[in-house]
Amino acid sequence: MPRYAIIDSDTASDDTIAILLASKFFKLLGITIVAGNVKFENEIKNALFTVEYFNLDVPVFIGSSRPIMGKWSTVEEVHGNNGIGDWKIEEPKISPEKEHAIDAIIRLSKEYEGELEILAVSPLTNLALAYLKDPTIVKRIKKVWIMGGAFSRGNTTPIAEFNFWVDPEAA
């Protein structure tokens, strides 16, 4: 039986690897983009480039371009200005979907009720906003896998991990 997933991503180099790995184990129903690692337009471009370059049949949905509250901080010093180590990539020929990521998450949770898994490798803004728009979503999602939090030391501050730090209200 196939496993169905959405990847919620702030597409930098680490997330492109996550997309490729996940595509081998899940039927990816979408990549939802959220503000995180680098400039938002670069995150969108990186997701589209990854899908196109590796010939993945996965729609890309644009989500929240800022945290729920507070100031958005990026980490170009970690991922390069474009999010993938300043590797020069071509402009993607494909475009993102017109449907907003939050609406896509809610819709897909209904279409794949009890089967949908969320692979959140980014700040949790899109997921929090989807929940605020439709609190019943939690009953329809099978699992949420989160790349976030810190057990002992953070990667952004001594105690905070980036994905939770950039939008703590969403986490």
Swiss-Prot record:
Pfam families listed in its UniProt record: IU_nuc_hydro
Alphabetized UniProt keyword annotations: Glycosidase, Hydrolase
SUPFAM superfamilies the record matches: Nucleoside hydrolase (SSF53590)
Family annotation (InterPro entries): I/U_nuclsd_hydro_CS, Inosine/uridine_hydrolase_dom, IUN_hydrolase, Ribo_hydro-like
The keyword Lipoprotein is assigned to this record: no
Domain of life assignment: Archaea
GO MF terms, alphabetically ordered: hydrolase activity, hydrolyzing N-glycosyl compounds
Family statement drawn from the similarity comment of this UniProt entry: Belongs to the IUNH family.
Protein name from the UniProt record: Uncharacterized protein in bps2 5'region
